[in-house]
């Protein structure tokens, strides 16, 4: 016959494992989103010809021409490395049966790191969005047109990359939330 305390212990252990599986899944999602964002941004290059007042102007665009896009690639690189490390550590601990966050210190470290990389991704996405908006709308006080009419593939690559950067931020914020749940449990 089972005592009530044993049943509660089994349920608590099962809940902890589900939370840990969700944490590992969030790490995997962040890794996939940030790696894909980086790959899409690195392939953002195109050449075209724009017609400005009857003059043919050759346009060439590459992600490396903009410091904001370079910042996006750098932020994605750091986040990929961090997420890969956390994912490998989480999978290892799941397979060995030990808790993913064995101490409060490590939980605080994960929380701080998730916040740091989350804000890094948000700032990179915001910086890239400003340049993308300028490319899409053109410069209003000069007669320069928007470049996205001529370089639509480049603009689509950049927009998809920035969408994935913001998705990576959501994964990091969710992972940070689960770490707060671990910290709030006595």
UniProtKB/Swiss-Prot annotation:
Coiled-coil region(s): none
Topology within the bilayer: Multi-pass membrane protein
Pfam families named among the record's database cross-references: CASP_dom (PF04535)
Superkingdom of this protein's organism: Eukaryota
Extracellular compartment residues: 45-70, 133-161
Glycosylated sites: 62, 135
Spans traversing the lipid bilayer: 24-44, 71-91, 116-132, 162-182
Primary location class: membrane
Family statement: Belongs to the Casparian strip membrane proteins (CASP) family.
Assembly: Homodimer and heterodimers.
Protein name as catalogued: CASP-like protein ARALYDRAFT_316979
